[in-house]
């Protein structure tokens, strides 16, 4: 009886180690994937990676109005939030396969 139990425990440990390696690889890949958030009909574009790091902000020249800087700020904010939301979705879909069925609190993955 004991021997079978230890074998199961060893198998479980091997599976957990394999899953840890796969999760680490998935985390690394998230940093390489990008998402794009936009606002103002594409006048502002924000590019972020799967780690929610902003990589680039693009502003089309015609949206820059020195008389209305507030609108430009609002558009940059909206595009940034859009990019971060998409980065969250990417992270959840990528990492969620590892936590499916674990019933983690607070919507973690």
From Swiss-Prot:
The keyword Transmembrane does not apply. It is found in: Cytoplasm, Nucleoid. Its main location: cytoplasm. Pfam families: YbaB_DNA_bd. GO terms for molecular function: DNA binding. It comes from the Bacteria. GO terms for cellular component: bacterial nucleoid; cytosol. Keywords: Cytoplasm, DNA-binding. Transmembrane segments: none annotated. Belongs to the YbaB/EbfC family. Homodimer. Binds to DNA and alters its conformation. May be involved in regulation of gene expression, nucleoid organization and DNA protection. This is Nucleoid-associated protein BA_0020/GBAA_0020/BAS0022. It comes from Bacillus anthracis. The lineage of its organism: Bacteria, Bacillati, Bacillota, Bacilli, Bacillales.
